[in-house]
Amino acid sequence: MDLIGLLKSQFLCHLVFCYVFIASGLIVNAIQLCTLVIWPINKQLFRKINARLCYCVSSQLVMLLEWWSGTECTIYTDPKASPHYGKENAIVVLNHKFEIDFLCGWSLAERLGILGNSKVLAKKELAYVPIIGWMWYFVEMIFCTRKWEQDRQTVAKSLLHLRDYPEKYLFLIHCEGTRFTEKKHQISMQVAQAKGLPSLKHHLLPRTKGFAITVKCLRDVVPAVYDCTLNFRNNENPTLLGVLNGKKYHADCYVRRIPMEDIPEDEDKCSAWLHKLYQEKDAFQEEYYRTGVFPETPWVPPRRPWSLVNWLFWASLLLYPFFQFLVSMVSSGSSVTLASLVLIFCMASMGVRWMIGVTEIDKGSAYGNIDNKRKQTD
């Protein structure tokens, strides 16, 4: 390990990143709370302000990926489609196999200039995660319980609110419903066999109802669906902790722009269309494992400096008073004060580790496991 790599793996560096993220995130959450008074007066202004506030937080994680770890993402796509990216609303269908797949999606959104306006269909539990979950509430993320009887009306109502959104956005949906694991895959393929559907090797059976309602509600304002198939070179298994340690990964993502008019309006036909899409995605993954590349022309969108500038702003604002506080605490010489300081550091470290744990595959959602669910019905 070189000197830079050794430095990146040090706890003190991680402490600095975590402090800046937590402190700035809580400040942003507080400002977002204050902006609620704007909503009844000017809803569109409220949305624009909160998109920028959201960027202040989410771009810090993108900075870690792009500038700290140096991770790169190569896009494989039709050159005729790339001029549309970032210039239109789109529904993004992304496979859900890696711990940092969401972060790669954010990186792409940042390079397209629309990170602050990125939306996602997420499990309701994430709304209670400090900073990120609270921030998402103010930018109209769509939360679901993953119980269709409860979600049918609430998800549709939330989606319809996005029809008059004032800026371009990407709406991400993981149709598999949960992150891929071997256990969940085995159960999912049993369901596929029972329904007479072709088996998938690299994906779970897609849950079609969430996708169908999303397309139905946004059809008139979203001109395309982006089918994104993500993988990593050299069979890497990237983690958020690895990114924090400065480990560099190289992602490859195959992006297909599918015009909305190519997707059936009928719910049953839309469901069949999505199953066919996932069979194609599976074939693309199989080809990638065989050859190491996806179809179409490789393209690397240029890295923008704004995520780094944003982090440097927050660091310069927050670190000086933080270190002043540390010096005063240490110089006090009080054993009680020092013990309190150590306790605060331990609690902060545990809190950040818990938030990182939300992304870890082996500690992820039990959704899709046969022990905690009924058989899939969509």
UniProtKB/Swiss-Prot annotation:
The keyword Zinc does not apply. It is a multi-pass membrane protein. One of its GO terms (biological process) is CDP-diacylglycerol biosynthetic process. Converts 1-acyl-sn-glycerol-3-phosphate (lysophosphatidic acid or LPA) into 1,2-diacyl-sn-glycerol-3-phosphate (phosphatidic acid or PA) by incorporating an acyl moiety at the sn-2 position of the glycerol backbone. Exhibits high acyl-CoA specificity for polyunsaturated fatty acyl-CoA, especially docosahexaenoyl-CoA (22:6-CoA, DHA-CoA). One of its GO terms (molecular function) is lysophosphatidic acid acyltransferase activity. A motif (HXXXXD motif) lies at residues 96-101. The HXXXXD motif is essential for acyltransferase activity and may constitute the binding site for the phosphate moiety of the glycerol-3-phosphate. Its EC number is 2.3.1.51. InterPro entries: Acyltransf_C (IPR032098), Plipid/glycerol_acylTrfase (IPR002123). Belongs to the 1-acyl-sn-glycerol-3-phosphate acyltransferase family. The chain crosses the membrane at residues 11-31, 125-145, 311-331, 338-358. This is 1-acyl-sn-glycerol-3-phosphate acyltransferase delta. The keyword Acyltransferase applies. Signal peptide: none annotated. CDD domains: LPLAT_LCLAT1-like. The lineage of its organism: Eukaryota, Metazoa, Chordata, Craniata, Vertebrata. Pathway: Phospholipid metabolism; CDP-diacylglycerol biosynthesis; CDP-diacylglycerol from sn-glycerol 3-phosphate: step 2/3. It catalyses: a 1-acyl-sn-glycero-3-phosphate + an acyl-CoA = a 1,2-diacyl-sn-glycero-3-phosphate + CoA; (4Z,7Z,10Z,13Z,16Z,19Z)-docosahexaenoyl-CoA + 1-hexadecanoyl-sn-glycero-3-phosphate = 1-hexadecanoyl-2-(4Z,7Z,10Z,13Z,16Z,19Z-docosahexaenoyl)-sn-glycero-3-phosphate + CoA; 1-octadecanoyl-sn-glycero-3-phosphate + (9Z,12Z)-octadecadienoyl-CoA = 1-octadecanoyl-2-(9Z,12Z-octadecadienoyl)-sn-glycero-3-phosphate + CoA; 1-octadecanoyl-sn-glycero-3-phosphate + (4Z,7Z,10Z,13Z,16Z,19Z)-docosahexaenoyl-CoA = 1-octadecanoyl-2-(4Z,7Z,10Z,13Z,16Z,19Z-docosahexaenoyl)-sn-glycero-3-phosphate + CoA. Keywords: Acyltransferase, Endoplasmic reticulum, Lipid biosynthesis, Lipid metabolism, Membrane, Phospholipid biosynthesis, Phospholipid metabolism, Transferase, Transmembrane, Transmembrane helix.
